[in-house]
Curated annotation (Swiss-Prot):
This is KsdD-like steroid dehydrogenase Rv0785. Pfam families: FAD_binding_2. SUPFAM superfamilies: FAD/NAD(P)-binding domain (SSF51905). The keyword Iron does not apply. It is an enzyme of class 1 (oxidoreductase).
Length: 566
């Protein structure tokens, strides 16, 4: 599905757009900005949406996404025998977030409000606008600690039928043909205009036209300047994941050394510029050291943006080894604790790890994040989806990474596999005996129906959930079983993705100053605001919460701005 929004009217580029009036300006045409614009337009207000990229990039990172949504006690869960509740979800959220700072007051208020939304009207509100949900519910971030610690106690990851593009299209369709909504692409905001202690507009640079495809780097050559005025400005410009300089600048000391090698899970235009611009205008920025970067990144053999990486969404069965060939500690199993794994890796002195698995595991347990890596789900082709899951071998996109990727090796014996791993570039040579000891010890634990090995126990527990048993988790077996071969190893990189801190706001998305009072006329939503309040997730996330955070905070910003304008 191509979402180019070619039928949506643009503000006239360059000096002809000078002085265009609007009730509200939205900076950023990603999901949060689109939702905010819909709320404003529904209330009869004139909206101008500015974005530094071309119209091909409408929808921002949501377009590239898997379309996962965090829902609580949904019909999809109940059909699968999952007993969820608001109370359990809030327990999981707060245990995961671990709020512990004075500046976490508003983020925690947002957390309570968001769980209310996810357990309440979120599903019905989205379905009324056209959302369709895939019937199997995924179980992300399983935790592995105690009941009050990190992780989802039950599966809550609901996949949009049509993935990210279908979710974006819900709001694009609402804005299409609305005469009160205008887009100004290739308009890069450089400054928020502050007059009389209030934000009254924006100034910036008109960039030269670009016909680059979605996600590809575009020119920053200036062809003019602009200034627009409005009663409200909503910043919905995204995070810092494409700006490795900012990622490194804000890297938390508690996470160990700053990685030297990073892949990018987002395009270069996810640059975090507006965070600093808002701060210069008086906005409080909190929790800049909280980030969400994935540890299962692989190099894209067909990159769209610089250092383009793809995340593996793994099932729980792969053996996870560090760069020295030692098994990661409990409970750092695939899909259990992203941040805990990241901290272990950075403190290990290396920037990569290994999955060791076999053909049987990769066939069922490897999914690649992103709509372009899931053409059956994205294209809403049920027949193709069923065929791809029923036939022997991994899904086509996974097989393509095995065949063409630079991070995968396979062999018929473990000794041959370790030799192949050692041939990959930029690796510390692995000792065969160290790897063999980890594999052999793990394989001994699957002989019985019970085990002291925490990962094997977790795999068996996961298979008691119908969704995992049917489509996600293989039965425990020896990695070295010839019938399950060949053996496979995947070199995993750290992949930048989400900004968890950001511009501080109240529950109406009003931007706050350092003294805690609102900066009149300014609102923030989406990743630039830490998905709500300056960090609704705290230190960690439960997954399916980023798109939902953009929707919830974008809705709050649109409604809050409309109320104040009226």
């Amino acid at each position: 599905m191509a979402l180019t929004c070619t039928d949506m009217s643009d503000a006239v580029a360059g000096s002809d757009a000078e002085g265009l009036t609007a009730d509200a300006i939205v900076v950023g045409a990603g999901l949060a900005g689109l939702v905010a614009a819909c709320e404003l337009a529904d209330r009869g207000l004139r909206v101008l949406i500015l974005d530094q990229e071309n119209r091909a990039n409408v929808g921002g990172q949501a377009f590239w996404s898997f379309g996962g949504l965090f829902l609580v006690n949904s019909p999809e869960q109940r059909r699968l025998g999952i007993r969820d509740s608001h109370e359990l979800a809030l327990q999981d959220w707060l245990g995961t977030a671990a709020f512990d700072r004075p500046e976490d007051y508003w983020p925690e208020q947002w957390a309570h409000a968001y769980v209310d939304f996810a357990a309440g009207e979120k599903r019905s509100w989205l379905r009324a606008r056209g959302l369709k949900i895939f019937p199997l519910v995924g179980w992300a971030e399983r935790g592995g600690y105690d009941a009050q610690g990190h992780g989802n106690s039950v599966p809550r990851f609901h996949i949009t039928w049509g993935t990210g593009p279908a979710l974006v299209d819900i709001f694009v369709r609402q804005l299409r043909d609305r005469p009160t909504v205008r887009f100004a692409h290739r308009h890069q905001v450089d400054k928020l205009i502050v007059e009389g202690n209030a934000v009254t507009g924006v100034r910036g640079t008109v960039l030269e036209p670009s016909d680059e495809p979605r996600g590809a780097p575009s020119s920053r050559k200036s062809v003019g300047k602009f200034e627009f005025r409005a009663s409200a400005v909503i910043v919905a410009s995204g995070g810092i994941g494409g700006n490795h300089e900012l990622v490194r600048k804000n890297w938390p000391r508690r996470m160990g050394r700053i990685p030297k090698q990073l892949l990018s899970g987002v395009p270069a235009h996810v640059d975090g510029r507006m965070i600093g611009i808002a701060q210069k205008a008086g906005a409080a920025v909190i929790n800049p050291d909280r980030m969400w970067h994935y540890t299962e990144g692989i190099t894209n053999y067909d990159p769209i943006w610089p250092r383009h990486g793809i995340r593996i969404i793994p099932g729980p069965s792969s053996l996870w080894l560090d760069a020295a060939g030692k098994r990661l500690p409990v409970p750092l199993f695939p899909g259990f604790d992203t941040l805990g794994t990241l901290e272990y890796i950075t403190k290990s002195g290396h920037d990569y790890t290994w999955f060791v698995l076999n053909a049987k595991i990769i066939e069922k347990e490897f999914a690649l994040s992103g709509q372009e890596q899931n053409p059956d789900l994205t294209g809403r082709r049920l027949g193709q989806l069923l065929r791809s899951r029923a036939h022997a071998g991994p899904p086509g996109p996974v097989q393509a990474f095995i065949d063409r990727g630079v991070d995968c090796v396979h062999a018929n014996s473990l000794r041959e596999l370790v030799a192949a791993m050692n041939e990959l570039p930029d690796v510390v040579p692995l000792d065969y005996e160290t790897v063999a000891a980890a594999v052999t010890a793990r394989d001994r634990e699957v002989v019985n129906k019970y085990s002291k090995d925490g990962q094997i126990t977790a795999i068996r527990a996961a298979r008691r959930y119908r969704g995992d048993r049917f489509g996600r988790v293989v039965a425990p077996h020896r990695l070295t079983d010839p019938k399950a071969g060949p053996l496979i190893a995947v070199k995993l990189h750290i992949l930048t993705r989400k900004t968890l801190g950001g511009i501080e706001t109240d529950l109406d998305a009003r931007v706050l100053k350092a003294d805690g009072t609102p900066l009149a006329g300014l609102y923030a939503a989406g990743e630039v605001a830490g998905f709500g309040g300056g960090g609704v997730h705290g230190y960690r996330a439960l997954e399916g919460t980023f798109l939902g955070g953009c929707i919830f905070s974008g809705r709050a910003a649109g409604r809050g701005a409309a109320e104040d304008i009226r």
